[in-house]
Amino acid sequence: KEGIIMAVANTLRQVRTERNICQEDLAIAIGSCGRTIGRIERSERSASLELALRLSKYLDVAVEELFVLDEEK
């Protein structure tokens, strides 16, 4: 499970920064809070299915791309 959370965090941070979106702006856009995005990116919490779908839709990235399972770790 820890490997999955880390992969999600890295992918989310990468997509967000590539698009020059700060955590707070992303959080507002998806109806969350900046602390939640920060915690996901630091692997302190995992995203719920609902939050994952909102992130995917807003960032225009398939859920499968955003939530990558790195089985080698």
Enumerate the predicted regions with their spans.
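DNA major-groove recognition helix of helix-turn-helix/homeodomain DNA-binding modules
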Residues: 31, 50-65
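Residue-level detection of the helix-turn-helix DNA-binding "recognition helix"
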Residues: 17, 31, 42-44, 71
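Alpha-helical residues within the helix-turn-helix
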Residues: 17, 28, 57
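Short alpha-helical DNA-recognition segment
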Residues: 21-39
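Short, charged recognition helix plus adjacent turn
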Residues: 1-5, 57, 65-73
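The DNA-contacting recognition helix of HTH DNA-binding domains
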Residues: 23, 34, 44-45, 63
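A short, Lys/Arg-rich alpha-helix, primarily the initiator
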Residues: 1-18
